[in-house]
């Protein structure tokens, strides 16, 4: 069977430019779809994308190329699009696997995510760069202040069960026992100044234990030692991410160990 295609969604910044190293390492023998968000990459766009429009565009693109589903890879704000897909009746059937980098979608009910990025004063070099070149840029600031709806963007671990290769409603207590392989990878940054990584990692660990108790392993969590987005400029971690994407693209993934991995 052919490998699953990839849908990649970038985060806040300058579009795909600082993801070129990662994109260049994606598998060469499958289709790659790149979803650009002009409203958060320093373009003069007043409004962000509508949820339904985004879901329909991604679903239609996959259908046009004959792909029933895909591996969704997203960084930072781009992970909200994955949340939209998983919450949509049609969209969730298109999400076979995911690789989420610095996801801002977990525990969004915690106000620190939006507050830290938009309103907090920077305290280190990385924070200064993000503050002056990203969060205070006119159109990015407008997008985050006026078009970021946490209740639509939030993701729960149970949402992974919407994926097409697991096929269970997140309201169901019945976790299939015959899909004992990891379909989803979450990579967090231990020094993240935006995502509350401590609470998020503890939440995901607890959900891993809960899912295992029901006889199902569907996601893993890895930890990068660095700040938000820094993993994308470390060649070793770019290779690690690319390897995870390659694994998720396999039509029949092997069983991998699940756990919270702390790597430098």
Can you name each region flagged by the protein language model?
Residues 1-41:
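Short, surface-exposed "cap/lid" segments of acyl-processing enzymes
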Residues 4, 214-264:
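Catalytic active-site module of serine/aspartate enzymes centered on a nucleophile-bearing elbow/loop
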Residues 22, 196-210, 236:
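Short alpha-helix in the alpha/beta-hydrolase fold that links the catalytic acid
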Residues 37, 99-109:
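Active-site nucleophile loop of the alpha/beta-hydrolase fold
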Residues 52-70, 83:
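Conserved acidic catalytic loop of the alpha/beta-hydrolase fold
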Residues 73-83:
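Gly/Ala-rich beta-loop-alpha elbow adjacent to hydrolase catalytic centers
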Residues 106, 190-195, 228-230:
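Acidic catalytic loop of the alpha/beta-hydrolase fold
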Residues 179-180, 185-188, 192:
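Short beta-strand/loop motif that positions the catalytic acidic residue
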């Amino acid at each position: 069977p052919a490998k699953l295609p990839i849908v990649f969604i970038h985060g806040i910044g300058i579009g795909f430019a600082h993801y070129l190293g990662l994109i260049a390492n994606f598998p060469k023998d499958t289709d790659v779809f790149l979803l650009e968000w002009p409203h958060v990459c320093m373009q003069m766009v007043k409004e962000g994308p509508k949820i339904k429009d985004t879901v329909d565009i991604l679903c239609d693109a996959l259908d046009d190329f004959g792909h029933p589903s895909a591996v969704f890879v997203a960084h930072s704000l781009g992970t909200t699009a994955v949340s939209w897909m998983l919450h949509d009746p049609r969209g969730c059937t298109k999400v076979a696997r995911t690789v989420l980098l610095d996801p801002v979608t977990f525990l969004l009910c915690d106000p620190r995510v939006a507050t830290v990025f938009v309103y907090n004063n920077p305290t280190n070099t990385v924070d200064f760069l993000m503050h002056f070149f990203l969060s205070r840029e006119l159109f990015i600031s407008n997008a985050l202040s006026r078009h970021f709806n946490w209740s639509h963007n939030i993701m729960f671990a149970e949402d992974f069960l919407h994926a097409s290769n697991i096929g269970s409603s997140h309201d169901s207590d019945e976790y299939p026992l015959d899909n004992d392989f990891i379909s989803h990878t979450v990579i967090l940054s231990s020094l993240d100044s935006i995502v509350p990584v401590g609470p998020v990692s503890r939440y995901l660990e607890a959900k891993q234990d809960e899912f295992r108790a029901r006889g199902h392993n569907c996601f893993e969590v890895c930890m990068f030692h660095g700040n938000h987005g820094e993993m994308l400029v470390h060649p070793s971690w770019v290779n690690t991410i690319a390897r995870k994407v390659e694994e998720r693209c396999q039509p029949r993934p092997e069983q991998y160990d699940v756990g919270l991995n702390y790597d430098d």
